[in-house]
From Swiss-Prot:
SMART domains: S_TKc (SM00220). SUPFAM superfamilies: Protein kinase-like (PK-like) (SSF56112). May be involved in signal-transduction pathways related to the control of brain development. This is Serine/threonine-protein kinase SBK1. It comes from Homo sapiens (Human).
Amino acid sequence: MSVGCPEPEPPRSLTCCGPGTAPGPGAGVPLLTEDMQALTLRTLAASDVTKHYELVRELGKGTYGKVDLVVYKGTGTKMALKFVNKSKTKLKNFLREVSITNSLSSSPFIIKVFDVVFETEDCYVFAQEYAPAGDLFDIIPPQVGLPEDTVKRCVQQLGLALDFMHGRQLVHRDIKPENVLLFDRECRRVKLADFGMTRRVGCRVKRVSGTIPYTAPEVCQAGRADGLAVDTGVDVWAFGVLIFCVLTGNFPWEAASGADAFFEEFVRWQRGRLPGLPSQWRRFTEPALRMFQRLLALEPERRGPAKEVFRFLKHELTSELRRRPSHRARKPPGDRPPAAGPLRLEAPGPLKRTVLTESGSGSRPAPPAVGSVPLPVPVPVPVPVPVPVPEPGLAPQGPPGRTDGRADKSKGQVVLATAIEICV
């Protein structure tokens, strides 16, 4: 089939290619291989997009592109259309993200994609289910944190999402509140999203550009030339930092490196060289501290699996000190306390949105951000109920014909992407 004069072919869903399936829960869902075969993208003009989709509002916008809430006119289905600027990402990276998300969609704790994949003149576009309550970052009161019952509901579901991914030998590599989507503000139903950096265990990747507070120490220390072999431990570490953030409304440190005094204090505690507790960790109970010691073990091989958090959720995680909101101002970056002396009980900084990119591969899609500073929001008041395990739902069915590859002169040419080598 040539691009200039393509032959018609029947509509098909975007599926993952490759022999075999992953064992365990969800068996039967094919996993992506390193060779993606003959995925097709249909080109739509702006007028064609508005013909099929009614714009409700813009959900987010950044240098990477934008996310729009739309209604597909054919069925009335609400969905989030993600427009990714072609200048900011490669086609193979876009297809990788869509394919991996699709392969994981059988989990009720991972965002689902619709059978909607196309391109415009400037963007690659795909559709995923709409999360009406935004993301987890939006509801965390800065320097206060969320109620413990809300946190436990969220952590339970994220642990199941990570266990599902890791059981298929896939590592998310960008776990943070911005990538956790909410269907209600009490976290009764949350889903993990944004798989643009996901890779298979053992895949060697370049060092990421810069670091964020969720980045594991071994990633911070990796050399730019050698890179790092992907391991589930980086997700477990980020999961531990995320739990700290949602409980406190603060970062535990700015970066997991020796230049950060708060991280160095934590390292001394982990190695048994600090009398007492690190200043930022005194609010936690003994069970919570044991949980953090496992999730945030300095050596990746000593970190427990993500699902290990479940046995700690039956305990109280924070003490009475947790209920006292912190009104301390952030210290300027150059005004840090000396590493040799005791640190005062103050936060290294309130939560802010973060972006991680692949080194040397151009900017990748980042989650939509309203701003670079946290927004004050009311604290949700949860109803005390046991941590729920949502029932698996049916995968969303999108409008047909988005990946059919059929020629239509009124809608531009058909672009074929064949035999793309992708490391996952």
